[in-house]
């Protein structure tokens, strides 16, 4: 018994479809983009949390990295705690923003999202010229 896709000459599996390479590349690029945004958010959250901790108790923050009787928490453990909270805020913030944009656009799949973004933003012109030859560009005259 043949599958439904075999009668038309098309593969039965969606992973073997001709456009699947482009879809997979799109998903990888999207993942890299979201990872970069998340990393930037984590860095911003870490810096913000660290600056708030320094503002709240600067004398404890500026003392050494060893915990003493006067300092119940070392600077490194304070920084790790700030990193943890900053990371949590960054991941939650990116998730909430992504979810809000997804719902505001009313899309149901990545293909819908891509077509919606292409309709909103202008197209990027492709350069038909070859890549810049740096040796010619940087050659002294």
UniProtKB/Swiss-Prot annotation:
Annotated organism of origin: Homo sapiens
Coiled coil, from the record: none
Any one GO cellular component localisation term in the record: mitochondrial inner membrane
InterPro entries reported for this sequence: TMEM242
Mitochondrial matrix side: 1-29, 103-141
Function: Scaffold protein that participates in the c-ring assembly of mitochondrial ATP synthase (F(1)F(0) ATP synthase or complex V) by facilitating the membrane insertion and oligomer formation of the subunit c/ATP5MC3. Participates in the incorporation of the c-ring into vestigial complexes. Additionally influences the incorporation of subunits MT-ATP6, MT-ATP8, ATP5MJ, and ATP5MK in the ATP synthase.
Keyword DNA-binding attached: no
GO biological process, one term: mitochondrial proton-transporting ATP synthase complex assembly
Pfam (any one): DUF1358
Main localization (coarse): mitochondrion
Transmembrane spans: 30-50, 82-102
Superkingdom assignment: Eukaryota
Family to which this protein belongs: Belongs to the TMEM242 family.
Membrane association type: Multi-pass membrane protein
N-acetylmethionine modification, residue list: 1
Keyword terms: Acetylation, Membrane, Mitochondrion, Mitochondrion inner membrane, Transmembrane, Transmembrane helix
UniProt name for this protein: Transmembrane protein 242
Quaternary structure and interacting proteins, as annotated: Interacts with the core subunits NDUFAF1, ECSIT and ACAD9 of the MCIA complex. Interacts with ATP5MC3, NDUFC2, TMEM70, MT-ND2 and MT-ND3.
Cellular compartments annotated: Mitochondrion inner membrane
Mitochondrial intermembrane compartment spans: 51-81
């Amino acid at each position: 018994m043949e599958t439904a896709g075999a009668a038309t000459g098309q593969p039965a599996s969606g992973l073997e479809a001709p456009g699947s390479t482009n879809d997979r590349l799109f998903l990888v690029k999207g993942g890299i983009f979201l990872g970069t945004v998340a990393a930037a958010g984590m860095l911003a959250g870490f810096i913000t949390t660290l600056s708030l901790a320094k503002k709240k108790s600067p004398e404890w923050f500026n003392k050494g990295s060893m915990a003493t009787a006067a300092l119940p928490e070392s600077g490194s453990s304070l920084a790790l705690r700030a990193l943890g909270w900053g990371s949590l805020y960054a991941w939650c913030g990116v998730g909430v923003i992504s979810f809000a944009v997804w719902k505001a656009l009313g899309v149901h799949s990545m293909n819908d999202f891509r077509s919606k973004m292409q309709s909103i933003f202008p197209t990027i012109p492709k350069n038909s010229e070859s890549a810049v030859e740096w040796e010619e560009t940087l050659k002294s005259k």
